[in-house]
Amino acid sequence: MLNKYNNLFDGSLGDFNVPPIKLEVKPNTEPVHSRPFPVPHIHRQTLYKEIQRMVALGILEKASCSAWASPTFIIPKPNGTVRMVSDFRKLNANLVRKPYPIPKISGIMQELEGFQHATALDLNMGYYTIRLDPGSQDMCTIITPWGKYKYLRLPMGIMCAPDIFQEKMSNLM
């Protein structure tokens, strides 16, 4: 199976075959524009490299101008890599959430009872496989010391991202 579908396991970014997602904001919402967070000198190059990696993968794109801007920072991980985090709290306060039921682990484990084998798969960059429509890309603009970048894919930190992702996964199954 790995040999037959080796392109699915190469570590690259996949593309969920669904129409681009449109994020909905509450009526009369004005764009939210924040200043960039200061980045400690020790982390500047690391953050810049992570942004460039995400641009190369097609997750981010340099934004020429946007009325929206959410600040971004990095959190070092124990394995030496970093997680880029965008502070979407102000955007989230203006988004309309459409809750989708997210299954509880305990329920899933009960369904597996009696099986002799189980497999765990990690969907590499799962949210990033879902494209955003142009208006949502604009709303998901981040600001850094090097300018603005817009997310082309569903970013982590958007309050409705888990609902959107779970709905797509449930429909896939």
What do these predicted ranges mean?
Residues 68, 113-114:
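Residue-level preference for short coil/turn positions at secondary-structure junctions
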Residues 1-100, 147:
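Reverse-transcribing Pol proteins
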